[in-house]
Amino acid sequence: MKNIESTACVILNYNDADTTISLVRKIGDYKNIEHIVVVDNCSADHSLEKLEKISNEKVVVCQSPRNGGYGFGNNIGVQYAKEHYGAKYVLIANPDVEFEESLVSVLQNKMQQDRSIAVVSANQRGVDGQLKKSGWFLPGKAETILHGEVLCAILLDKIGGRKLGATPQSGWKFVDCVAGSLLMVDADVFLAAGGYDPEMFLYCEESTLGRKMMTLEKKTALYVSESYLHNHSVTISKSYNVKGQREQLLKSTLTYLKKYCDASKFEIHMASVLYKFGTLELMVIKEIKRLFRR
C-alpha cells in the first residue's frame, strides 16, 4: 500500500462552540488527519471568539460569509482544505460525533484502494448504543413525498433497513447515500460535482450528494464492521425547535423534488400537505409525552 494522500477534517459549527472544541481536542493528535478546518457558520452567539482560541498549526478557524446551512458551510470547508492544503480526502464531521483514529485509516485505505469510490462512511450509533440509519438507497419521488407523514416515514425506514440488512453484516456495503454526520469524500470529485446543494439549508443533502455521485458514476460505500458515536441532533436541537426543524425539512424536500426528481405541481402540493400534517402529528405526540411526564 502506498502512502495515504493528504487528509483534512472539516467541522461545521453553529452556536455550539463547546461541542466543536471538544471534538477538535479529541482528534487533534490523530496522525492520519493532517489539518482540521473549523467553519463557523455565522453563529449568533460568541462561538467565533471561543473557536479562534484553539487555532494552531494544525487547526484553522474560518467564518462563512452567511449562515447558509449545512451544505453551504461544509462546501466552504472542503474548498478551503483543497485550496490551502491540497487535501485529497476530506472527513466531514458533525461536532456531535466521536470516532477513533483507526476508523479514519479504514476509510482512507478504502478510498485509496478503489478510485471508483468517492464517498465512504461507517455505521453510526446513538448514545444508547443502538445502531442508527447509516446508509440507504436513493429515495424516489413517491417515497420522498410519503416520508412527510410520521407513520409512513417509520414504515419506509423499516423497509429500507431490511433491504440493507439483506447484505453481509460485516465489511463493506455499496449504498447510494450515507448519513451526513460523518463521511469522507474525495475532495476533487466532491468539488467537481458542485459539493452539497447550497439551496438546501439543513436536510436532504445526503440524498442529493448520492444522486450527484451516481451522475458522475462514482460509488458510495459503508463500512459496517465499525461504528462511530453520534449524539444525534444535539447541535440542531440547540438551534431549532420541532416546528423549525420540520419547516427546514419541508423546504429542502421540495427543492429535492423539484431539482432532482422532476416532480409535478400536484406532487409538490401533496408533499407540502403531508409534511405539514406530519409536523402537526409530532407536535401532538410531544404534547402527549409532556402531559404524561407530569
Describe the residue ranges of each PLM region:
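Glycine-rich, basic loop-to-helix element that forms the pyrophosphate-binding segment
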Residues: 64-84
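A short, conserved alpha-helix in the catalytic core of glycosyltransferases
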Residues: 168-170, 176-227
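Short, flexible, basic/aromatic active-site loop/helix in glycosyltransferases
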Residues: 139-175
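Short beta-strand-to-loop acidic/aromatic patch adjacent to the donor-nucleotide binding site
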Residues: 86-98
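A conserved acidic beta->alpha catalytic loop
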Residues: 17, 40-49, 66
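Conserved donor NDP-sugar-binding/catalytic core segment of glycosyltransferases
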Residues: 98-134
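Short, well-formed alpha-helical segments that are part of the catalytic scaffolds
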Residues: 15-29
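Active-site-adjacent helix/loop segment of glycosyltransferases
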Residues: 208-290
